[in-house]
Amino acid sequence: DLVVDTGTGNPGAVGIDWIANNLGALRRITVRSGDGQGVAGVDMTRAWPGPALLRDVQVEGFEAGIRVGNAEYGLTLEDITLRNQRTVGLSNTDNVLAIRHMTTEGVPLAIDNSGSGGHVILLDSQLNGSGAEAIRNEGHVFLRRVASSGFDALLLEHGTARPGTAVLDEYLTGTVQQPFDSPQ
């Protein structure tokens, strides 16, 4: 187990600036800012992160908890806890993220999926905070068993608030397409 503490008085700090390709993982890690300042807890905006795994990662404080950028190659996140970020818990720009068991606490925005190429799959997660929406989506999302509290809406998609603020059993951007008839 590893704890990375950026201390106090470091407004430009990044807890972990990380990139992995083909085989890499961050596991059992806590990243925290002593005074809540700093740019990001885990920053993966350098070209080109993934495939990689983040598992059992906690981030406390910072402007953003986890930042992901670039259109390649996809990341898997599981058992993620993001607390008290000033702007956003998880920011994704044009990458593909598969997330299971993510919890946010005290964030104004849980997930910002920006860029038309961004894809977020979010399963079995609890988004707690306070703000207009828990998830802001400008790309594509698939949500299953996602609950939220404290937000006005669970999802703002392409500028339109989607109904439902507490629990969403299943939702996806667009429509389901299948080549053959299938029993539902």
Give residue ranges: language-model regions:
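Extracellular/periplasmic carbohydrate-active domains that bind, remodel
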Residues: 1-184
